[in-house]
Amino acid sequence: MGKIFYEEMPVCFNARELGYANAYDVRKAAYLSVFAGAWGHTYGCGPVIFFGDKGSNFFANLHGWKEGLDFTAANEMKYLRMLIESRPMLDRVPDQGILMNKGSCGAERIQATRGKDYAFIYSAYGRDIAIKANAITGTKLNANWYDPRTGKTTFIGSFDNKQQLIFTAPLPTASPVPSQREDWVLILDNALKNYAMPGDKH
């Protein structure tokens, strides 16, 4: 079970120099840990820990606990569950071996998990994702981008499974500046399986 950042908690208990954990920090920790093999993830929120009003304690410097109940990442955790439950779970394993590029640690990390006929690849900073040939079953693969902020998917296309594939994540919609990237999930499916997208009814 993964539990790393609490949303709006001082990073390393040093808010003056490091600021506060935001929705991206929390989301990144959740996806990286679950895709790497954690059975689940525990979401935490700084202001809710002691149910304090704004300014009443160290964990509620910016907002009170009632506001914390509706924090951004608190609402985004359901999209991770929707994604995981949209495909067969019991044969899913972490597998960095399907990647040509794994990134480094932290913000540069690219983490892959797959079943026999599907794969999820999380790019923590929206870096290009390069996939080896025959990473999963099927002669044709359907590829989609999954937005962990909204739970929405965008169809990329269908591709032959016999060659290396490179996918470039969408640029940020709010601020399309190359240095300001966003995290994304690449969904690859054996086209013959006709899997529904996360949140859709099968």
Describe the residue ranges of each PLM region.
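Residue-level detector of conserved, well-ordered beta-strand and adjacent loop positions
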Residues: T168
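Aromatic- and carboxylate-lined catalytic core of secreted/periplasmic carbohydrate-active enzymes
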Residues: F13-A15, Y24-G157, L171-H202
